[in-house]
């Protein structure tokens, strides 16, 4: 890990869920509250701010300029932003994102530049557009200090990407205590792969999009019994803070109270006691036990599906609904995670069920998913 990475505070400020003046308008960022949030974060020792070309429909970067860049010296903070090449209609437009981001941010360079959400068919778009070489060239020209990528795929995909692109300075991964040994996310294995390549990790989704803060009551009670004074959020963040090879842990903060709480929890961070670790293990076991579809993500069902239904993804989302008891949240995830092959396109041919080693009634489960999420 680079020396400057060693001194990066472990709490990072994610600028994807900023406070809004109008909840129905993602562009209506509450700048005055955002300024207070930035001040509180920096006063608490934070320096890392994470944004992206598309956050808040393109206004997050400009808001960060107003709340941070225009008000603090350049050596008081670091900024990460991202390129979504797979959403661009041409290589030229994808490459122009960086210049636009720099203009919006009011910066001559960004400290961290990510090729965002690499994986699956999206990787081919980054390759075809020459984005890997473009990002490295931007680093050579001083427009970018560090180049990396974010991804949601498993460990084998990460291994392939880091082997193909050994020049990466960092990688951004979904890591949290619920996904640590998840057979789809493979957070533990991904962390091991990154460490083996000597690439530090920026952690995203440490609280699973807020779901580890809104736990089912019986799960929350297990954690509170072990430490009545600890917030549910602090359990999620402490798990990530104390992992090796972590550059920083992002929190998408939406109001001043969240910043204050996260800063306080960060400043009080310590490793879990044996009792706390047992409580977390019990909480995870309970959450896992609430997942009733025994899918292991073997993916035997996918290859011959004539409709291209993303069956393991959909079954995983059904399990997530059971674990979190929050259908609205999972429905939001479904809208993009299942977009390549939604449940309603199933024609009930039964090919998948014939291939499933777990004997899952897949056709029925897809009907349930379509009813719940579409």
Task: Locate predicted features.
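Short beta->alpha linker loops
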Residues: 55, 59, 152-153, 254, ...
